[in-house]
Amino acid sequence: MRRVVRYLSVVVAITLMLTAESVSIATAAVPPLQPIPGVASVSPANGAVVGVAHPVVVTFTTPVTDRRAVERSIRISTPHNTTGHFEWVASNVVRWVPHRYWPPHTRVSVGVQELTEGFETGDALIGVASISAHTFTVSRNGEVLRTMPASLGKPSRPTPIGSFHAMSKERTVVMDSRTIGIPLNSSDGYLLTAHYAVRVTWSGVYVHSAPWSVNSQGYANVSHGCINLSPDNAAWYFDAVTVGDPIEVVG
């Protein structure tokens, strides 16, 4: 009888050890939850009125390790149930881009963690630059307002094709060829001040006034990638455009 009791005691002890070890292994196999960093800023600003292509940009205080968890914490809603997708542009910056454009004159609600903000869209003011036609056509809510002669990037410095949006408006901007790798002493070098500049890309593409290329506008592409307009046309577009308005470049 003592042998049976001793045998059962050993079996129970081994079972408890194995169970404890299994729990320990299972616990170790589950990665700890990563905390979601705090929110540094949300763009567009609360209450802003922007163009229909403006993405929602959320900047966090520190780099994000669990991107899916962060994406799940961001809530975008409109009366039209606009669909879109996330794009990470830096380790702590994510943007939500509508698949097409926001509907004009729509309220967009943005929730991030405990924050709830919102902005509105204005008219659908769309600028279309045609590389082959050498034109820049602006329409508002489907109605063409003006088709302007333009000069885009020359073959060695082509204007990128795609869908963009007006990122900022600068009454004057200094353009320095060294920022795109061209020395000032090169035959292609330049250092000049451009007026009525609307930023298209962070790499330095603008729609801007270019009195030096007026004779080529409508006929030839001679710029370093920017969309050149006459001073009058550039001033007109500068006054009409809102940050977030779509800018499309076609072949």
From Swiss-Prot:
Is irreversibly inactivated by the beta-lactams carbapenems via the formation of a covalent adduct resulting from acylation of the catalytic Cys; ertapenem and imipenem are the most efficient drugs for in vitro LdtMt1 inactivation. Cephalosporins (cefotaxime, cephalothin, and ceftriaxone) also form covalent adducts with LdtMt1, although the acylation reaction was 7- to 1,000-fold slower and leads to elimination of one of the drug side chains. A high drug concentration (360 uM) of ceftriaxone is required for full inhibition of enzyme activity. Is not inhibited by ampicillin. Keywords: Acyltransferase, Cell shape, Cell wall biogenesis/degradation, Peptidoglycan synthesis, Periplasm, Signal, Transferase. One of its GO terms (biological process) is regulation of cell shape. It holds the Pfam family YkuD. Residues 1-28 form the signal peptide. Consists of two domains connected by a short loop, which form a bent shape. The N-terminal domain (residues 32-122) resembles a c-type immunoglobulin (Ig) domain, and the C-terminal contains the catalytic site that is located in a tiny tunnel. The keyword Signal applies. Monomer. Imipenem binds at residues 208, 224, 226, 228. Its EC number is 2.3.2.-. Induction: Up-regulated 17-fold under nutrient starvation. This is L,D-transpeptidase 1. Pathway: Cell wall biogenesis; peptidoglycan biosynthesis.
